[in-house]
From Swiss-Prot:
<dbReference type="GO" id="GO:0005829">
    <property type="term" value="C:cytosol"/>
</dbReference>
<dbReference type="InterPro" id="IPR029047">
    <property type="entry name" value="HSP70_peptide-bd_sf"/>
</dbReference>
<keyword id="KW-0067">ATP-binding</keyword>
<dbReference type="GO" id="GO:0140662">
    <property type="term" value="F:ATP-dependent protein folding chaperone"/>
</dbReference>
<dbReference type="GO" id="GO:0044183">
    <property type="term" value="F:protein folding chaperone"/>
</dbReference>
<feature type="region of interest" description="Disordered">
    <location>
        <begin position="603"/>
        <end position="638"/>
    </location>
</feature>
<dbReference type="InterPro" id="IPR013126">
    <property type="entry name" value="Hsp_70_fam"/>
</dbReference>
<dbReference type="GO" id="GO:0051085">
    <property type="term" value="P:chaperone cofactor-dependent protein refolding"/>
</dbReference>
<feature type="compositionally biased region" description="Low complexity">
    <location>
        <begin position="603"/>
        <end position="620"/>
    </location>
</feature>
<keyword id="KW-0597">Phosphoprotein</keyword>
<dbReference type="InterPro" id="IPR043129">
    <property type="entry name" value="ATPase_NBD"/>
</dbReference>
<keyword id="KW-0346">Stress response</keyword>
<dbReference type="GO" id="GO:0016887">
    <property type="term" value="F:ATP hydrolysis activity"/>
</dbReference>
<dbReference type="InterPro" id="IPR018181">
    <property type="entry name" value="Heat_shock_70_CS"/>
</dbReference>
<dbReference type="GO" id="GO:0006260">
    <property type="term" value="P:DNA replication"/>
</dbReference>
<comment type="similarity">
    <text>Belongs to the heat shock protein 70 family.</text>
</comment>
<protein>
    <recommendedName>
        <fullName>Chaperone protein DnaK</fullName>
    </recommendedName>
</protein>
């Protein structure tokens, strides 16, 4: 069995880790970094860039440089959070035919899982380069508060990237695994506060150790899937834009190029203000008007940034209270607080968390790498490489069906340990009703329409009977990935219907297969391009070395041979400008054939040079045989 890699597919950055023996190891990508920006760019010449190369060219290509795609994955276009992003993102978010949020890239409609798959492919390649063997299986992490549609969409992204997703696990749970695995922690209750680039989670986790076996049991989880570092950046960007407008009278919001530069500068300033009290946002030539170029130079203090984002930090406190309440614990029951996600480096976040829990958070967990390490550990558990670890996760939201009067009736309540299965018997609302519609919902609201609709299906063929008589058994079954399977059975007729919830939207099997094929075709064209470049380099080298040999041969090369070689060189030079690998190889072969006489001359010259240098060495050696004699002056005795 091959390695199961662990991938933290983040909103801002992604990370990949593997189990190396009993230790988890975070892998460096091709650029030498341990984390990869979750940025994908589609260039004008058809190239797809991922990570740092995509980030570097964002300023000149803002409309086709996609970031924070995780905020859109598994979401509907009409969702309030998506509509907020539509107005602030430089790229184009559109509604797909099925109502999902998709993207328009250079006139082509693309689904978020298809774009996230590019990041996963880079993670896969990073692991393959390190291991020297193909990787086909992965554990991928998601925010604990992701709903069913978002989890399913993440699995789809894995499939498009050529990975069999063996398990989807929650990010805070993964961080707890990373924290608890190599420590003699004994029995402890920990709080994992995970504030990443686009999502926020809090999980209360109990680690029990009995006879060397550790059980990680999630007691409760809560969060906000649209709160993260990107929102902090946006607050600072808006402040800078407003200040510039006050000063210069120009609104930069209409200039995508300026906004992209501003985004980079705001992110940099935010990071600097975690260690410094103030920083300068200095952007020369940010824009221009009739009077000439304009420059931005605005001082930002840590206090100013904190005042801009205070409500965002406070928004993360309410879920902490709910999670503790759901776990049946008080603040004093928490032994350790672990911070995960880059945004937790902000001093104000650390201070608020410390105030809430009444203790300083742990500093020995790397907030950028802990989640990927935990995913790799879970991969090790699945392959059997990691023993004595049991992970008990929970479903973050209640699951149920719509019943008479538009009410949500839960079958599985939130924070139920998964995998789990629950059945309940329902009946008809009308006399002689021959079919029922099972409308599956996820959420905590009493009114069905206020919850997330995950899908619906019909059970027909019910025998005619007075209302309330037929017995329809509805079964909810959640697997270890937190994905829901629903069945409904008429106990009288024995008729049954089953579905795996893929949300009322989501990608269908045909779309996923097409995207998998496209990804494979791209991989093939990438391989061909790489081979073409290698052949070009070989041809280029042959061209230069042959020209040099012709020069050195001088008059010793017969005129006929020289003409034939010149002609072959020109033919190769022309072929190198084209895209045909076979043509380049053929011209290289032709040049090699007509250059035989030249090769002989070159070899003779080389032999003569060697003989000459051997003679010179021999002469030097003779000179070396002369010994400097020592002598002393003898004075005559008088």
């Amino acid at each position: 069995m091959g390695k199961i890699i662990g991938i933290d597919l983040g909103t801002t950055n992604s990370c990949v880790a593997i189990m190396d023996g009993t230790q988890a190891r975070v892998l460096e990508n091709a650029e030498g970094d341990r984390t990869t920006p979750s940025i994908i760019a589609y260039t004008q010449d058809g190239e797809t860039l991922v990570g740092q190369p995509a980030k570097r060219q964002a300023v000149t290509n803002p409309q086709n440089t996609l970031f924070a795609i995780k905020r859109l994955i598994g979401r509907r276009f009409q969702d309030e959070e998506v509509q907020r992003d539509v107005s602030i993102m430089p790229y184009k978010i559109i509604g797909a035919d099925n109502g999902d949020a998709w993207l328009d890239v250079k006139g082509q409609k693309m689904a978020p899982p298809q774009i996230s798959a590019e990041v996963l492919k880079k993670m896969k390649k990073t692991a393959e380069d390190y291991l020297g063997e193909p990787v086909t299986e992965a554990v991928i992490t998601v925010p604990a508060y992701f709903n069913d549609a978002q989890r399913q969409a993440t699995k789809d992204a894995g499939r498009i990237a050529g990975l069999e997703v063996k398990r989807i696990i929650n990010e805070p749970t993964a961080a707890a695994l990373a924290y608890g695995l190599d420590k003699e922690v004994g029995n402890r209750t920990i709080a994992v506060y995970d504030l990443g680039g686009g999502t926020f989670d809090i999980s209360i986790i109990e680690i029990d150790e009995v006879d060397g076996e550790k059980t990680f049991e999630v007691l409760a989880t809560n969060g906000d899937t649209h709160l993260g570092g990107e929102d902090f950046d946006t607050r600072l960007i808006n402040y800078l834009v407003d200040e510039f407008k006050k000063d210069q009278g120009i609104d930069l919001r209409n200039d995508p190029l300026a906004m992209q530069r501003l985004k980079e500068a705001a992110e940099k300033a935010k990071i600097e203000l975690s260690s410094a009290q103030q920083t300068d946002v200095n952007l020369p030539y940010i824009t221009a008007d009739a009077t000439g170029p304009k420059h931005m130079n605005i001082k930002v203090t840590r206090a100013k940034l904190e005042s801009l984002v205070e409500d965002l930090v406070n928004r993360s406190i309410e879920p902490l209270k709910v999670a503790l309440q759901d776990a049946g614990l008080s603040v004093s029951d928490i032994n350790d607080v672990i911070l995960v996600g880059g945004q937790t480096r902000m001093p104000m976040v650390q201070k608020k968390v410390a105030e809430f829990f009444g203790k300083e958070p742990r500093k020995d967990v790397n907030p950028d790498e802990a989640v990927a390490i935990g995913a790799a550990v879970q991969g090790g558990v699945l392959t059997g490489d990691v023993k004595d670890v049991l992970l008990l996760d929970v479903t973050p939201l209640s699951l149920g069906i719509e019943t008479m009067g538009g009410v949500m009736t839960p079958l599985i309540t939130k924070n139920t340990t998964i995998p789990t299965k629950h059945s309940q018997v329902f009946s008809t609302a009308e006399d002689n009703q021959s079919a029922v519609t099972i409308h599956v919902l996820q959420g905590e609201r009493k009114r069905a329409s206020d919850n997330k609709s995950l899908g619906q299906f019909n059970l027909d063929g019910i025998n005619p009977a007075p209302r309330g008589m037929p017995q329809i058994e509805v079964t909810f079954d959640i697997d270890a990935d937190g994905i829901l399977h629903v069945s409904a059975k008429d106990k009288n007729s024995g008729k049954e219907q089953k579905i795996t919830i893929k949300a009322s939207s989501g990608l269908n099997e045909e779309e996923i297969q097409k995207m998998v094929r496209d990804a494979e075709a791209n991989a093939e064209s990438d391989r061909k391009f790489e081979e073409l470049v290698q052949t070009r380099n070989q041809g280029d080298h042959l061209l230069h070395s042959t020209r040099k040999q012709v020069e050195e041969a001088g008059d010793k090369l017969p005129a006929d041979d020289k003409t034939a070689i010149e002609s072959a060189l020109n033919a190769l030079e022309t072929a190198l400008k084209g895209e045909d690998k076979a043509a380049i190889e053929a011209k290289m072969q032709e040049l090699a054939q007509v250059s035989q006489k030249l090769m002989e001359i070159a070899q003779q010259q080389h032999a003569q040079q060697q003989a000459g240098s051997a003679d010179a060495s021999a002469n030097n050696a003779k000179d070396d045989d002369v010994v400097d004699a020592e002598f002393e002056e003898v004075k005559d005795k008088k």
